[in-house]
Amino acid sequence: MLYVAKTDCTDPYKNLALEEYLLLNVGDNVILYLWQNKHTVVIGRNQNPWAECRTSLLEEEGGHLARRLSGGGAVYHDLGNQNFTFLCKDEHYDLQKQLSVIQEACRLCGIDATFSGRNDLLADGRKFSGNAFYHSKGFSYHHGTLLIDTDMDRLGRYLSPPKAKLESKGVTSVRSRVVNLKELSPTLTCAKMKEYMTRAFEAVYGQKALLLPVPEEAILLPMAEKYASADWLYGRPIPFNCTIQSQFTWGHLQVLIEVNGGVIENVQVYTDAMDFALAEQLRGALIGIPFRSEELVRAVQALPYGEDLAQMLRAQEL
């Protein structure tokens, strides 16, 4: 069955909780979840909040910081942005089909949208949608933003990605590479885009979508509290002795290492890689081994992107 879930809530922690709840309860169905957050920077599962966002400025101006389950980079949400999430069993997960829904919704408002790179949708050569992905225990979701009429000044002020990441994309600022769809379709609103997304969802999947009732707030409260907690948002800082970082085609990586008696005692990994499991895999591979280049290289070679990681570590001459 196809379902559309909608909410008028604009609290990022409650909305992320609902997203997780839907994933846990999607069953054999495919759900399109449409939602909006008010004045929020949402960072990827493994990102460093202080490196990606001007957190103090965001807080001073009444904004919220949120961290999602999926990997990828930081994005700004306001009520000029429309979020979407496709949720289903792995056997029903079809990225091209899901992207086709977004492209069809854009076509309905006269915009030609194309997929670019690892996770972006472009219109007029500029990004209007960043996408990210999460897979767990046979279920998956694909979610993203749709910039309709977002406050670009705030977007540019709050987001502060590493300089190397921007240089790798050939741009000088976050703002210079994004576009509001309203600029290309002046009568477009978030309300209209929700209608277009629903119509496109039904057209691409070839069946009528039913409206899915949203659970009571009390059911979502424990998950919402997790997403709002300082532990989830910021983690526990470690007294690191060594910082290693590099920019790859698959994302930016920063590794903080705490060494005690010549042995790696703790590791913190920050990355915007789309593979949300990479950070924990890398951390697990490094903790407990001698702090020597050859040992580190040996430990990472079997991991995803192992050769890239090995080359980064060899270059450190530890």
State where each predicted segment sits:
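Short, glycine/charge-rich beta-strand/loop segments that flank catalytic centers
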Residues: 36-41, 114-125
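A generic structural motif
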Residues: 88-92, 182-187, 270-273
